[in-house]
Amino acid sequence: MIKRLALFGAAALTLTACAPDAAAPAVQAPGAVAEELLLPLPDATTPAITAADLAIRIKTLADDTFEGRGPGTPAGEASAAWIAAEMARLGAAPGGDNGTYFQEVKMVNQTVDPATSELVVTWPDGEDLSLGFKSQAVYWTKRQNAGQVSFAPGDVVFVGYGVVAPEFGWNDYAGQDYTGKTVVILVNDPGFATGDASLFKGNAMTYYGRWTYKFEEAARQGAAAALVVHETDAAAYGWDVVTGSWTGAQSDLVRADGGASRAALEGWITRETAEQMFAKAGLDFTAQKAAANARGFAPVLMEGLKARGTVNQTIEPLSSRNVVAVIPGATTPDEYVLYTAHWDHLGMKTGEKTGREGEDFYEDDIFNGAVDNATGTAALLEIAEAMKAETLDRSALFVAVTLEESGLLGSAYYAENPTVPLNRIVAGINMDGALPIGLTRDMVVVGYGASQLEDRLKDVLATQGRSIKADPTPQAGYFYRSDHISFAKKGVPMLYADGGEDKVDGGVAAGKAAAAAYTAERYHKPMDEYSDDWDLTGFEQDIQTLFQVGRDIAKSADWPTWYAGNEFEAARKESLGGQ
């Protein structure tokens, strides 16, 4: 694990007025950060974007002291304070609530007690199967106003992909009333399963394929419980990611209705469990899955099966924070170029054996999130420092959002409660999860083919002898799995560019191998740790590239647009008054 950095005295760490270097004037109260920092700010960094400066910031943000940057926790919120203090040190002005660097995000943590909770399926012969928590199922409730949430025995219905998409002529829920019933749902969408380009978007996952949508739609249909069947290829991650991500404290925004509109129970079940349930109902899982891929699929009652459940939970109202900073433009300061990255990760899961025996990380309970997303947050700070050294026409807006790991909640909150009008944000760039694999010949654009920002990226890459590459795994739905989507839904043109895949040392095969190894061994696990042997040369070049794209827009009068026909084009036109 990373060694904890030595703590300074409290007096040295309290920022009532920051003391930045000579190149960055002090940011005065009320925008100052009046909190004690758990870890010191860097002694000196430079406006040049360098691997050395990135390493300092990544290492600090991924340090054990911040305990995995869990939103609402003292250590997690201390990491947000550190980011704000670093923005102040760099000379960026506060852009949050009441002249501060913070936008408060009211949240609630809900923690299931597996020992007293249950999810029970009754077979046709009357025998009960209580699904093993983590071995067969992981479940929770989004209802926030009760320590115990139950649903009575009810029918179980297979609803295919659980999609209602009029634009695709698709309705998996047609013809039934789902009140009091448990729905069983496939992950992803029919386009992925079949590879048929005429279904949805073919191999590229749509939002209808996301687990978030599945549970939202089940609630709209009035279901008592919603169970998504986990399959590694379709989900793009293994069952260990499910057990690591959806157990322990689960965060949500405070909802006006206390979550009453959601199903009583939401969860994942293993494919093996699903196969057992289908067999008991006299159905073949593989055959039913194939049927769900065809237009005109009708939901299937799983004859003789009943499901009931009880979730006992602790509920803890908390508050987290988005960190917001701005570097004002000189000519049109009311127009903004946005950079985003999420600062949060999964926090601590005390007492869990999350590694493999013999590894240093065995029984480590801190999910440090070095790649995910200390890298993106470090890049946000690095670009802010570089922008401060420039004379910009437009303002540069930096938002480090919370609660990404809980379903993009911090960015969704900001998009609903923006600190600047969203129709004054000219364009945005999101940074999330860069792998330290060295120099590459390309950069991957997630959701490629979306906006004119890609043309600008392509031009910058050409000056480096590099190229742009479409997402090699569109079936994983990464375009809908990071914070740019919250702004895109509001019409803001967004670019989400990851590091490249074609390594200078080793080619595409080496790049694919590195990505696969990270997903298998480190993603959403305590093993996502910083190491001093990371090769950040490629990350340095990528962040220089994203800085240049944003800087050039901030020094121009151009308004990049979505490509014609893009799903977010209409929202942008509406926000701009039909322009």
Task: Report the location of each language-model feature.
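Acidic/histidine-rich catalytic neighborhood of metal-dependent amide-processing enzymes
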Residues: N203, A234, G347-L453, A564
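Noncatalytic luminal/extracellular "stalk/propeptide" segments of secretory-pathway proteins
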Residues: E67-A197, L301-E303, V311, I315, ...
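C-terminal motif of bacterial Sec signal peptides marking the signal peptidase cleavage site
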Residues: L15-A17
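A conserved hydrophobic secondary-structure block that centers on an alpha-helix together
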Residues: V159-D240, D334
